[in-house]
Amino acid sequence: MGNTNGDSAFNKRTIAAALANYIDAGSIVAGSAGLSLWVSYLKLSDTQIGLLGALSANAISAAVGALLGGFLADKVGRKAVYTNSMLVYALGICLVLFGVNFPMLLSGYIIIGLSVGADITASWTIIAENAPKKNRARHCGVAQVAWAAGAVVVLLLSVLAGDLGLLGNKIVFAHLLVIALITYILRIRLPESDAWQTKNQPEEAQAEKPAVLNKTSYFDLLKPMYLKSILFLMGVYLVWNLAAGVMGFFMPYIYQQVGGVSANMANLLQMGLFIFTGLGVALIFMPFADKYRKTVFGIAAFMAVIGWTLFLLPVEGLPILLLFIVVIGINNGAGQQANYQLWASEIFPTQYRASAQGLMFFLVRISIGIWSLFVPMIITNFGIGTMAAILLGCVTASMIIGLLFAPNTSGKSLEQIQEELYGSPQSQVKKGTESKIM
């Protein structure tokens, strides 16, 4: 749908929605950075630590939030979800800031995760629906820049406030609370998604016709015409995320093992990785993906193949790590992550767009959580080389699937893409897309 605010990707509607990614990345990094401090303060057991990790914004709570948020965004509107999610998020942050026991801390982590998951699905959807058809990649790229910025800022704040102990980590979370409240103020003043309004207004105006398209269910997404799109996107994104999940949580450890660097240097390398991610989005994906999408995807996806191959070479040390963060940063910025956001917003009809993204986000985060249980065992028993070989297979498979089956959607409106893939909305009804609410 065309954007009445102009073609600039950095307009209020896009930035307000893109801040979801800043908050997502910031929550994950802040939670990870402060974990050891909370363990010391509350004398947490291994079971309690495991619960915090499993139910954090990087795992189960975010997955469940995405599932709920996706359904609600299709049912009641994108704005209702992505606006109110900020208030829920603020509640979760306050529980962390004022937490004096484990139940308060765990509740805060869960609420943060639920709100982040719901926010991501609604925000990604509204960005694509409000973007001009010729510049959709540029607009979606703003969200990926925000993700990298969130990670870098939180890492930097964590380093600067490190000497303050737990208070320093609370300052980091407090900064996220401020961002969330600013985001809420921005969003409450903005209109609903054009595409969602267009879909629903005619149905309300024609009372004699049943509002069949408004009755959505996750079971509808199991129909062959939608399932094949989900399988394609999971082949690209979920498989790639098996590597990305390891990179996000275990890379500082791998840096120390392969490069022999200190813990502080490992954190600096991780910050460098996020910086190159932002550069990959801003300098490669945003300027070129609207016109040369498959080429951009292929080159950026191949960067991940190069990156994980480096750990199979008989060479170790800091130079290998520096080359790794450059090529993986480019991949993170212009490869599977950014293209997934774009494709997932394009290839589903309006009435299922957010639900489909919620379902896939759920599957990805749950899969990462399960996979992460086995990663330490593989590294300990078989070595980093074996893990690198497995992840090399994942990113290679993801690249091949993307190159073979990527849809031709560049420069087309969402309505045109929907009609090419599924026919007109009327024909969808005739095919039996009407269903009961989940």
Swiss-Prot record:
Domain of life according to the entry: Bacteria
Compartments in which it is found: Cell membrane
GO cellular component: membrane; plasma membrane
Pathway linked to the protein: Polyol metabolism; myo-inositol degradation into acetyl-CoA
Record-annotated membrane-spanning stretches: 15-35, 49-69, 86-106, 108-128, 147-167, 171-191, 230-250, 268-288, 295-312, 317-334, 359-379, 387-407
Pfam families: MFS_1
Keyword tags: Cell membrane, Membrane, Transmembrane, Transmembrane helix, Transport
GO MF, one annotated term: transmembrane transporter activity
Bilayer disposition of the protein: Multi-pass membrane protein
Any single GO BP term: transmembrane transport
Matching PROSITE patterns: MFS, SUGAR_TRANSPORT_1, SUGAR_TRANSPORT_2
Alphabetized CDD domains for the sequence: MFS_SV2_like (cd17316)
SUPFAM superfamilies recorded: MFS general substrate transporter
Similarity comment: Belongs to the major facilitator superfamily. Sugar transporter (TC 2.A.1.1) family.
Something else known: The growth-defect caused by the iolF inactivation was only observed in the iolT-null background.
Function: Minor myo-inositol uptake transporter.
Name of this protein: Minor myo-inositol transporter IolF
Native source species: Bacillus subtilis (strain 168)
